Amino acid sequence: MKIRETGTRQQHNLRRARIGCVILKKNVTFTMGIRFSRWLVGCGVAIAFGVLSPSVTWANPQLNALLEQGNEQLTNRNFAQAVQHYRQALTLEANNARIHGALGYALSQLGNYSEAVTAYRRATELEDDNAEFFNALGFNLAQSGDNRSAINAYQRATQLQPNNLAYSLGLATVQFRAGDYDQALVAYRKVLAKDSNNTMALQNSLTSLLQLGRNQEAAVLFPDLLRQRPNDAELRIKAAVTWFGLNDRDQAIAFLEEARRLSTRDSAMQIRVGKIYETQNLLPQAIAAYEQASFVDPQSREAFALYGSAAMKTEDYINAIIAYRALTELSPTDPAAFYNFAVALQGRRRSREALEALEMARDLYQQRGDRRGVNITESLMAAIEEG
């Protein structure tokens, strides 16, 4: 009777774990770090509970006890204790794939990916038709930084279960991380064929296409992504780069301005947009973005330096003076800031102020032992005095 009660309880837990696994597969989320531990938790518990059959107990009472204790610790997320129990169990039953799989799962949850790889690799040797094990092996290999081996493991998982969305997504994401953009696209398209609104598949397909210079194909993916992420400034920047590649400057500018609007209080984002404008020789737009960046973060040396530089390129000396004056206040020991400030002042024929700034620049160059800087500064001073 006791065995039957234990089996019934484990059967309930196993059913619950498997249900959780299915649910988590649908909601799997990835970042560039391939975070799919939420999915792994659900499936790992199912594997771990499968160590001890719901209806059959092992002949060895000591093994039964160790596995029950390991499963209980796993359920309670006491992974270090679970590892101890499973390792002891393996001394009694060394060739059981399920015990190796449970050990691998517990090790993975502790962040010990290299040892988890060893456990899952042994599990796959003992059960070479178990897609769950190959999937878990792929995850831990990827977390260990061995993307090539991870790809092989995921490919085996997808061969065993070609219709499993999570496995295809895992394969695609590791291929993407490894820079295999062509192969990642193939895998992501399989995901999108089953789940056309999968945001991660859409985003990484998009990035893969952009990396491959296939802008026309990338453009097709944007409508769905833009609709799904109406407040994503980063996505608008990618869209802008795509449309610049398609020589549609007006649409690209519209995307960049939308990105700016979505991040008006983000100095770093304003700088990014400004740099894109500058590479496209759209200097008035770049100046506006850099000016906004300096307004949001008045301590940003980078923002003021870029602001001043872009203004000088268009001979917008008033904005250049504003930018470089602020930069000299933020960097009072930077001779280049004073030199550029002087050039901007001279652009407005403010010679006396320009000479004062150049004297400061020369002194700072001398303090640094920068003879070339001193010579350039003195040459400009002489030209102003002669003119």
UniProtKB/Swiss-Prot annotation:
Alphabetical list of Pfam families matching this protein: TPR_11, TPR_16, TPR_19, TPR_6
Stretches of the chain forming a coiled coil according to its record: none
Ranges annotated as spanning the membrane: none
Keywords: Repeat, TPR repeat
TPR repeats: 63-96, 97-130, 132-164, 166-198, 200-232, 233-266, 267-300, 302-334, 336-368
SUPFAM superfamilies reported for this sequence: TPR-like
Name of the featured protein: TPR repeat-containing protein SYNPCC7002_A0425
Organism: Picosynechococcus sp. (strain ATCC 27264 / PCC 7002 / PR-6)
Organism classification: Bacteria, Bacillati, Cyanobacteriota, Cyanophyceae, Oscillatoriophycideae
